[in-house]
Amino acid sequence: MDGYLLDTNAASILWDARHRDHRKIKIFLENISSSPIWISIIVLAEIEYGLKIVPRLDVGRQDDIRNEMAKFLLILALDKHTVAPYSDLRAELFKKYAPKDRKGRLTTRRPEDLVDRTTAKELGVQENDIWIAAQAIQYNLILVTRDRMSRIAEVSTTLTYPLQIAAWK
């Protein structure tokens, strides 16, 4: 598969015609429009969550954003093939950025001890960003984001298929 995968920050601005950077993302995407542009189910969930908790956004604007979301047809779900790139990214992030006192602690054999409780704050990466990046790697898509995602990009260079990022501003 080829094309682009929109990160939450890109999709939310694309679907909000009143956002000050809406025109910028539209122009950016028009310049790459010969390739398919995909969206992750995680991005849809993050935006819907945001709409539900932001009380200052008027109902009409929320409806406009939801209508734009509904028009987007190229949606990627998580599946068993997302597991490998996700776990590879998360493991590399853990090895590189977890606090030293956490790195040697997973030596027991009880299943409940194998669950990693290292937080996004400790790794410097949001959990959903790892999932979205994993989908981009899984499908060989270029991730369109406003974030640098420097830690994810850095550790992905050790993987068979590193993350490709197209940053827009």
For the regions a language model picked out, list residue spans one by one:
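Acidic, PIN/NYN-like endoribonuclease modules and their adjacent C-terminal/linker elements
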Residues: 3, 121-122, 133-169
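Active-site neighborhoods of divalent-metal-dependent phosphate/nucleic-acid chemistry enzymes
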Residues: 49, 74-146
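Short, mixed-charge aromatic SLiMs
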Residues: 70-74, 159
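Short, hinge-like loop/turn segments at secondary-structure boundaries
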Residues: 55-58, 93, 161-164
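General small-molecule cofactor/ligand-binding pocket signal
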Residues: 38, 76, 166
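Alpha-helix capping/helix-boundary segments
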Residues: 10, 43, 82, 131-132, ...
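Short, well-structured N-terminal submotif of metal-dependent ribonuclease cores
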Residues: 1-70
